[in-house]
Amino acid sequence: IKNEKWFNNTIFVITADHTSPKSVDKNYKNKIGRYSIPMLFYSADNTLKGQSNVITQHIDIMPSLLDVLGYKKPYFSFGESVFYKNSWAIHKNNKRYCLITEKGILNNIDENYSSFSDWRLKNRIENDKGNIKFLKSFKQHYSKSMIYNHIKLKYEL
């Protein structure tokens, strides 16, 4: 594809859906690790160099691309650019919501909260009130946006 006309004007995003549940690696064979995936941004001009260990998720792809392109107009997204330092991820599995931040992992089942410092959820830590507030507001914003069909801007291009 390097010989295609569009190649030099394309940003490629390579990622995965989730890890295999049959993984033998202890870092991935757990409730958090199974959602750990690589995310690679590539451009032919090599402007996207380096490696980052920030916590990201699929909802960060669009804001990241808009950031790289220098897009400044308003847009709707639950994610953030991976090129910012504010890193977090949220996922839901059955009744369990999980917020992953640099401070740890916050589990939420039926409004009961527990926090852990490790991906295998063995080392409990004190709940971070800021993380609880963030997770509650995210869930509320997401639910209301879905219920009232507000997952769009009223802004016209």
Model-assigned labels for residue ranges:
Residues I1-L157:
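Solvent-exposed soluble domains appended to multi-pass membrane proteins
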